[in-house]
Amino acid sequence: MRPAVSVITPFAGADAELDALIGRLEALRAGPEDDLLVADNRPRPAPGRRGPVEIVAAAGLRSPAFARNAGARRARGAWLVFVDADTAPRADLLDAYFTPPPDDDAGILGGGIRDVVDRPTRVARYVVDREKLDPRHALGHPHRPFFQTANCAVRRSAFEQVGGFAEAARAAEDADLCWRLQDAGWRLEERPEAAVEHRARETLGALLRQLAVHGAGVAWLNRRYPGSDPGPSLRQLAGRLSWYPRTAWSRARRGEREEALFVLIDLLALSAYDAGRLRSNDARR
């Protein structure tokens, strides 16, 4: 028997998106001791129950971290499973997280994340090709590994021990939580079979806005954990402006037109990410 879990999803979208999210959560194979929670982070939340899904009011700071903490306070389970609103979990997600049972010192379990194309735009194909949310990127972080809150499970006692998410953070709260858990003696365990599909961004504007938010998050992390991600040097920035256009031109001359475009998007993506480092990551501002 696996432990009781609480599935928590932060939400800040439109009503139609909420309907679709509830449908995806209803498809999970959940037991009678599990609860399915949507933490409604909109300015005017709509708390209540929709079938097996409870919508929890999470008005206040506009940040996923704030919403997840609000959901965690309502949760009953021994484990808190966090999935994002733009993901589609596999029906067996909850069972897969606990097969095999986690070790006693495992504080957080990281599931699989696969980008998928909803509308086959060039940008969506780029995101899938570059595997932007592949968990290997987070696990290979030069400071310390972490799991992404797009899909992870946290032991409730460990979560409460470290005080939950830094709820004023707009981004990078997942790395911060994982690093505080490791500082407290908890281990990370991978659960790649506990998988979700993540809907790839479909437009260049949406992708660049997302990356700018992530850039603000890593700059915030670097202030909290000095040296964890100091950003590129001026020499590295200058090198990009030369290498990426030359590489794109070379690919185009060989007839690899889509890959040439992808290389140019790489440059724009890096630029948005680095520009985002200049922005505040504080939802109170």
How would you describe each model-predicted region?
Residues 23-33:
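Short, acidic, metal-binding catalytic loop of nucleotide-sugar glycosyltransferases
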Residues 80:
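Short aromatic/hydrophobic "clamp" motif used to bind/position activated sugar donors
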Residues 58-75:
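Glycine-rich, basic loop-to-helix element that forms the pyrophosphate-binding segment
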